[in-house]
């Protein structure tokens, strides 16, 4: 079953085409990786799916329903959660509170930043037990009272994943989940992604770590200049002459 369908997306910024007729589909229960050089349109695609930017043409459907024109918080409520390259953690807030705030964050970033006195007014309503379970899942149960800024970069990546999971979404959009981290943490995150897939989650990720992509992906999609240039199982896509010419050489 197709969980996500992207149809002929076009988006230009100051005359530069970031998306140029990009189409793809994500099957339910798959781990799909999107690769491509810088400027290929990968993060622009994620922003379009999540409603952070309006496209010039084309459409996005999730579970058969159009996402066009919906605000990001409405798209999140339909069952799409995401991470960002720049992590977007609250560095001066505890690990536990970051995850608890994650329940709010995916409902619209403007909501998160506009809440005044959240800690005193709404902490009693936060699902602390669920947040602790998510931190245990990612291996940060011993860090719940630490400030986010005191975590290593790899641990911050794990915390970002826990925050993403707070919405219990069906589709996870992960922007470079293992970029810039040590091999041990990379393997931990890849293991977590496989566990999430086994539990019924669908994962669509952007990643430059080709070895990680080959290890974890069911399908790899290669983008170049805003278009899809290849798609298929990793072992086949990585040998595609067009891919080798455009990206891997």
Feature map (PLM): residue ranges:
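The feature captures the beta-strand-to-loop junction immediately N-terminal to the Walker
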Residues: 35-37
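Conserved ABC transporter NBD signature motif
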Residues: 58-65, 78
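Conserved ABC ATPase "signature" region
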Residues: 111-143, 191-194
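Conserved ABC ATPase signature
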Residues: 147-151
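Catalytic Walker B motif of ABC-type/P-loop ATPase nucleotide-binding domains
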Residues: 172-176
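A short, surface-exposed alpha-helical micro-motif characterized by mixed small hydrophobic
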Residues: 213-215
